[in-house]
Amino acid sequence: MDQAVLKAAQAALAGEHAAVYGYGVAGGHLDGARAGQAKEAYEAHRARRDALERTVRDLDGRPVAAAAGYRLPFPVTDPDSAVRLAAELESRLAGVYADLVGAATGALRGEAAAALREAAVRSVRWQGDGVAFPGLAERAAPAAPSSPAARP
């Protein structure tokens, strides 16, 4: 068994546990179409979580359990903060799925890539804009030198 694959699968599973919790919080502050989006995302993350539990077992691992509660990145008190939370959940999941894509091969890599794509699409739906490479930390481009380095 490849420990890197198992570790990445466990991280994705932990991310899905957090997403299920987070969407439970966010959904309580949304109504109408946004509440419907949150419910769909909640169900999708439950399904991914269940699939990842099977994957971890198939990798001879013991699936990481959900925490009793999760620290939210900011207070969620209204629809705007609930939408921000949903976008944050998806962005974080894109990161763990990018790691799983990098570690896995074959069918698991394909499943992780599909989950990464879905998280990126949901993130854009929640926040209205996307990033060039979902799941990869945005890095500032190095500054170009304005003049050649001085030579001794």
Regions found by a protein language model. Name each.
Residues 1-152:
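All-alpha RGS (Regulator of G-protein Signaling) helical domain and cognate RGS-like helical scaffolds
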